[in-house]
Amino acid sequence: AGGHRVRVVGNLDDAQPADVVVVVNPNNPDGQTYSPGVLISWAEKLAAKGGLLVVDQAFTDPTPELSLASKADISGLILLHSFGKFFGLAGLRLGFASGNQETISLLKRKLGPWAVSGPALEIGARAYGDEDWATETRSRLARDRARLDQILSENDFEIIGGTDLFRLGAHEKAGQIYHLLGEAGILVRPFPDYPKWLRFGLPGNDVAFSRLAAALGGLSGE
């Protein structure tokens, strides 16, 4: 943590009296969100005492109304962006930070050059410029998220939250379900500190949805 004293809190209101606050918005894995207005207020309060708000927007692209991109020039704010989550090209290894000129200049001096390949820059620029694809993908993800929620609910999962890219559910037999799904070739994420939780990525197509539904249905029938 670079010599900083780090405190992990579950709610932004509990972050006082920190000078630097890092918020993942939406949060992974529970999908907790804060409105742009709340985050801007925090950035202004922190900037007034020489502090900084860092907002990780890795999972914001499906819900652009949560993005602070249009406010990136205010003092005391750094936004972190991840290309691979929304565009499905994690191997491209492309991400970036945005903020006002003074903040970004300071960040560049502290971090030094960060290598990004030419193909990654070209693919990223084209992808971010394809607004029609982004609009259609957001609609599809919202539909698929609702479809996944239905499958999980039908198999006795409590939907805790998530985003339009993944869902977090709780089940009394989560540990057993994790192993049996793995044997069926379906990988989900467990949480050792929360043994009832499983995180599900959105199935990629109708066949994958059917496989998941059949696997969970078979488990519940045992």
Predicted regions and their residues:
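PLP-dependent aminotransferase class I/II
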Residues: 76-152, 157-159
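Active-site phosphate-binding strand-loop segment of PLP-dependent enzymes
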Residues: 4-62
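PLP-dependent enzyme catalytic core of the Aspartate aminotransferase-like
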Residues: 35-37, 183, 193-222
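Helix C-cap/helix->beta junction micro-motif
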Residues: 2, 48-49, 74-75, 155
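Hydrophobic residues in well-ordered beta-strands that form the structural core
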Residues: 8, 55, 81, 188-190
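Conserved PLP-binding catalytic core of the aspartate aminotransferase-like
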Residues: 142, 152-184, 202, 206
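A general structural detector for well-ordered alpha-helical segments in enzyme core domains, enriched
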Residues: 38-42, 68, 148, 177, ...
